[in-house]
């Protein structure tokens, strides 16, 4: 946003990449599209000091390898995330257990250890997302109204980076599968083969689905491109329903749309996609 308004930017990130949680191949597309927006992108770097001077704000950096550097800026925006306020709202005075970090533990009905007190949203733990909180609130309201069967039992919760292009992912990521040794089948459909993406002039993205190598059930998916956040809900539904690559691939998607790339990614995994040349084995 600041770059769009004409500001020159340096971005500092202590970890080894932006958008932690998303697969690196998704982020790579975003980074390539936005490289021109940054004068510097300093990864594995932390800010160790800032001092107001006559020329501006002098900021000191230190890399994880011990290297040191400085920069002078007109403005500094520090994004430090959020911390739960469980210890600040007096919940413990009502008998509610509050964890050491300030989170409040709840059961599947969003009850705290005090049966008539419920907690939802960021204060009950990760992921700190509004759409998760809304579903938790529904459960809490239903239980408080007398529904003894209501539970928060979502298998997956989608995440979206509302950037340009958008990055969205849900369920198991490819990086997680590799780290955990889970064997998966991948179906990746590049938007360079999407008629709608080409017509939009935005074919830089792709849609990726991951399936269990044996059962062929979908485990996760990621999308990078315009309106990725609008599309990821279908992948979440497929995971919740236990769909496999045939279920998704045989579902007729409207053409030409970006959404049909989900069906085509499933076809790629199945080996039946006719919109791409055959994959070499």
Q: PLM features: what roles do these ranges have?
A:
Residues 69-146:
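FAD-site-proximal beta/loop scaffold in flavoenzymes
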Residues 49, 95, 109, 208-210:
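Short, surface-exposed charged micro-motifs
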Residues 54, 100, 213-215:
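Short acidic-glycine loop/turn motifs at beta-strand connectors
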Residues 1-67, 127-134, 142-176:
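Rossmann-like dinucleotide-binding cores of NAD(P)H-dependent redox enzymes
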Residues 24, 53, 118, 223-224:
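Residue-level structural signal for beta-strand termini and adjacent loop
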Residues 145-146, 162-281:
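Flexible, glycine-rich terminal cap/loop adjacent to redox cofactors
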Residues 12, 62, 98, 106, ...:
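Hydrophobic alpha-helical segments, especially N-terminal targeting/anchoring helices
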């Amino acid at each position: 946003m600041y770059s769009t308004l004409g500001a020159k930017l340096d971005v500092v990130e202590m970890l080894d990449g932006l958008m932690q949680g998303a697969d690196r191949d998704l982020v790579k597309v975003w980074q390539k599209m936005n490289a021109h927006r940054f004068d510097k992108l300093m990864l594995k770097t932390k800010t160790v000091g800032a001092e107001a001077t006559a020329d501006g704000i002098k900021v000191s950096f230190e890399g994880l390898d011990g290297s040191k550097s400085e920069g002078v800026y007109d403005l500094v925006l520090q994004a430090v995330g959020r911390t739960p306020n469980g210890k600040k709202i007096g919940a413990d005075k009502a008998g509610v257990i509050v964890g050491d970090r300030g989170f409040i533990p709840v059961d599947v009905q969003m009850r705290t250890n005090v049966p008539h007190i419920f907690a939802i949203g960021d204060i009950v733990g990760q992921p700190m997302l509004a759409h998760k909180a809304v579903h938790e609130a529904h459960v809490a309201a239903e239980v408080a109204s007398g529904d003894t069967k209501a539970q928060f039992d979502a298998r997956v919760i989608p995440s979206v980076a509302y950037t340009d292009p958008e990055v969205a992912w849900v369920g198991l990521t490819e990086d997680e599968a590799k780290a955990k040794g889970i064997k998966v089948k991948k179906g990746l459909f590049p938007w360079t083969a999407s008629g709608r993406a080409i017509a939009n002039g935005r074919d830089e993205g792709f849609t990726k689905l991951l399936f269990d190598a044996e059962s062929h059930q979908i485990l996760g998916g990621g999308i990078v491109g315009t309106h990725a956040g609008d599309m990821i809900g279908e992948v979440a539904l497929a995971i919740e329903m236990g769909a496999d690559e045939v279920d998704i691939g045989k579902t007729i998607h409207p053409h030409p749309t970006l959404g049909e790339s989900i069906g085509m990614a499933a076809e790629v995994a199945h080996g039946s996609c006719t919109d791409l040349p055959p994959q070499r084995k």
